Regions:
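Active-site groove signature of glycoside hydrolases
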Residues: 57-76
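Surface-exposed, active-site-proximal loop segments in enzymatic domains
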Residues: 30-43
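Short acidic capping loops at alpha-helix termini that bridge into adjacent secondary structure
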Residues: 16-19, 23, 63-67, 94-98
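Beta/alpha (TIM)-barrel catalytic core signal, keyed to glycine-rich beta->alpha loops juxtaposed to Asp/Glu
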Residues: 11, 73-172
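N-terminal binding-site loop/beta-alpha segment at the start of enzyme catalytic domains
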Residues: 1-23
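A short, structured active-site edge motif that brings together acidic residues
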Residues: 18-30, 127
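Alpha-helix N-cap and loop-to-helix initiation/capping positions
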Residues: 3, 7, 40-48, 75-82
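Short, acidic/polar
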Residues: 42-61, 82, 104-116
Length: 172
């Protein structure tokens, strides 16, 4: 729970001005025990947003986040102005520099990405994109270029399939 942030905080301690730090929030992993692969509850309300950010800042050993991301927001979240007013307030307080939407697996999510670029002050959209999974990436990349919104690619190696380490003899 927050292990990656703790590790990043330790590794880059004393080097804050030399790195760009991005993290994301929405899943309430601190107050819920995860059982299996069931999705954890998502929260974007102001109280949770502030608490999640405070905890991330502590784990990352910094006083601000360069790019703060909404993790897998659904369309109803993109349309919720309160969420983005909270994030704009955090920019005003100097706790984050900008924010993004970090979208889920490649199937679907096109509308969420486009709506975020069209209607909200996002600086970037994070999406799955690789030679095997180009939807919705192609459309989001095109729209991002039109709107001057950055695209952050995740899973560029198709979860290891494109590394050459997975072959017909690999047991899954």
């Amino acid at each position: 729970k927050g292990k990656s942030e703790k590790l990043i905080g330790e590794v880059f301690s004393g080097m804050r001005n030399e790195v760009v730090i991005s993290t994301k929030y929405s899943y309430d992993f601190e107050n819920v025990d995860q059982i299996g692969h069931k999705e954890l509850p998502q929260r974007f309300d102001p109280e949770f947003t502030n608490r999640a950010l405070k905890n991330s800042l502590a784990r990352l050993q910094t006083d601000y986040i360069d790019v703060y991301g909404l993790h897998n927001p659904k369309l109803r979240h993109i349309h919720d102005d309160t969420i983005f007013q909270t994030l704009d307030g955090l920019i005003g307080e100097g706790k984050i520099k900008t924010y993004q939407v970090a979208l889920g697996p490649a199937i679907g999510w096109t509308e969420e990405g486009i709506e975020a670029m069209e209607r909200k002050n996002v600086s970037a959209v994070q999406t799955v994109y690789n030679i095997l999974e180009q939807t919705p990436g192609n459309e989001l990349i095109e729209r991002g270029a039109e709107k001057d919104v950055g695209i952050l690619v995740r899973v560029p190696d198709a979860s290891g399939i494109l590394t050459g380490k997975v072959n017909e003899n690999t047991k899954i």
